[in-house]
């Protein structure tokens, strides 16, 4: 019992701190809207406002556009700043991982659909981590629709999109399936 006491105290402290922890309150000045990119699929789009050329932030896997809440407003001094939460995450729609729903080209098409719906012309796209493949998909297929691409920590296969070897579709489908399993209360042990 003498050795268990410190562990019990530590466990109690962790539980107590968990009870005290609250969901962070987003106090950044932005508008939230939902853009329908295809039937039954709506994406959450944050608009931090600003003047100047458009700048669109795309978060990495598992994140939402709210990842950029801390610093996006600083860019609004020189740009009109947006953030898109990709399908399958956050408040955006969560379609089943089938029929290429999570391929790089499909995710890139979602970005283009948001741009079209909001009349955003030639933005600079800024993508973190796996969003690099979305950027590469858009930039390689429609270079005339973007003013530039900025890769943040995207030095993986995701940033080097090659339509002949679409890694992202398989990986995103697997990630989505596993997230759905966890949320349903079970995890596949494979």
Regions of interest found by a model, annotated:
Residues 7-18:
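Bacterial N-terminal signal peptides
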Residues 38, 46, 86-126, 130, ...:
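Active-site loop/oxyanion-hole signature of alpha/beta-hydrolase fold enzymes
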Residues 80, 121-163:
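Conserved hydrolase catalytic core segment
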Residues 41, 46-94:
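Conserved HGGG/HGGXW glycine-rich cap/lid loop of the alpha/beta-hydrolase fold
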């Amino acid at each position: 019992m003498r050795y268990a006491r410190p562990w019990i105290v530590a466990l109690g402290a962790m539980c107590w701190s968990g009870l005290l922890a609250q969901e962070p309150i987003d106090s950044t000045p932005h508008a939230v809207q939902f853009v329908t990119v295809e039937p039954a699929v709506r994406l959450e789009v944050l608009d931090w406002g600003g003047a100047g050329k458009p700048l669109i932030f795309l978060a990495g896997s598992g994140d939402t556009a709210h990842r950029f809440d801390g610093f996006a407003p600083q860019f609004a001094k020189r740009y009109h700043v947006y953030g898109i939460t990709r399908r399958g995450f956050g408040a955006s729609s969560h379609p089943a991982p089938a029929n290429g729903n999570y391929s790089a080209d499909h995710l890139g098409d979602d970005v283009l659909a948001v741009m079209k719906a909001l009349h955003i012309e030639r933005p600079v796209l800024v993508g973190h981590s796996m969003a690099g493949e979305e950027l590469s998909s858009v930039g390689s297929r429609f270079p005339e629709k973007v003013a530039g691409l900025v890769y943040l920590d995207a030095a993986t296969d995701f940033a080097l999109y090659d339509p002949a070897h679409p890694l992202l579709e398989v990986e995103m489908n697997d990630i989505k399936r596993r997230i759905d399993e966890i949320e349903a209360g079970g995890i596949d042990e494979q």
